[in-house]
Swiss-Prot record:
Gene that this sequence comes from: nucS
InterPro entries with a match to the protein in the record: Endonuclease_NucS, NucS_C, NucS_N, NucS_N_sf, tRNA_endonuc-like_dom_sf
Any one Gene Ontology cellular component term annotated for this protein: cytoplasm
Keyword match Nuclease: yes
Family recorded in the similarity comment: Belongs to the NucS endonuclease family.
Function summary: Cleaves both 3' and 5' ssDNA extremities of branched DNA structures.
Protein name: Endonuclease NucS
Keywords assigned: Cytoplasm, DNA-binding, Endonuclease, Hydrolase, Nuclease
UniProt KW Mitochondrion keyword: no
Molecular function as annotated in GO: DNA binding; single-stranded DNA endodeoxyribonuclease activity
Annotated compartments: Cytoplasm
E.C. no: 3.1.-.-
């Protein structure tokens, strides 16, 4: 993990265009190739980023940029598309690198952990012919909650949340990008499963080709037999 605090401007060029004017920001360069641009307020989310796989090229600025005070230019190129993140660094205030090693991943507790266990035991809840490959399928960027096969034998990656929001869809998207590079698993499609899924998350999931499934936690635990209820 490389952390750089710098005065910089940022441009995203590709399927969409975005510009961040000159300001002091935190640049995170991760071992998986992703680059994230953070500010000190507004949101815990990055202002802009490039997802892996991507390559970072550092170059000297052109004369016109030198005149504007640019000392170094970063070009982060997506390996899959023509999208680029261009970071013009005017001044580095701090820079440090750390080897964080292999992360064991998020250890879930409470309802999410129970949902994972229950769905793994009742994988047919997702459809006829579904079978479990394994829970906590490890990847270089973290564990996939459940990896399964559908009735046609295709691989399915399942992300579980108690309350599903956009961040969960983004997380599953990253897993799918990585898993689909494995010829032994591809093609891999995604299912975003939760007790409640926010409308914005459903829209984003649909745009990404990810199915959304609402889980009845009580019914899965055998507490609430929905078929026997009068109301």
């Amino acid at each position: 993990m490389r952390l750089v605090i710098a005065r910089c401007s940022v441009d995203y060029v590709g399927r969409l265009k975005a510009h961040l004017p000159l300001a002091t920001r935190l640049l995170l360069v991760k071992a998986d190739g992703s680059v994230l641009v953070h500010s000190d307020g507004g949101s815990y989310k990055p202002l802009n980023w490039m997802s892996p796989p991507a390559t970072l090229r550092v170059s000297s600025p052109e004369d016109v940029d030198l005149e504007l005070g640019v000392a170094e230019q970063w070009t982060v190129q997506s390996a899959k598309t023509d999208d680029r993140l261009i970071i013009n660094i005017h001044e580095k205030l701090s820079e440090t690198s750390h080897d964080l090693g292999v992360d064991p991943g998020l250890i879930k507790d409470g309802v999410e952990a129970d949902l994972q266990r229950l769905l793994a035991d009742q994988i047919e809840t997702l459809g006829t012919g579904y079978s479990l490959i394994r829970r906590e399928y490890f990847t270089a960027i973290g564990p996939v909650d459940i990896l399964a096969r559908d009735g046609d034998g295709a691989t399915v990656a399942i992300e579980l949340k108690r309350r599903g929001d956009i961040d969960g869809v983004e997380q599953l998207t990253r897993y799918l990008e990585l898993l689909n590079r494995d010829p032994l698993l591809a093609p891999v499609r995604g299912i975003f499963a939760a007790q409640q899924i926010k409308p914005q998350a459903k829209v984003l999931a649909n745009d990404r080709g990810i199915d959304c499934v609402t889980l009845d936690y009580d019914a899965m635990r055998g507490v609430d037999d929905s078929e026997s209820r009068l109301f």
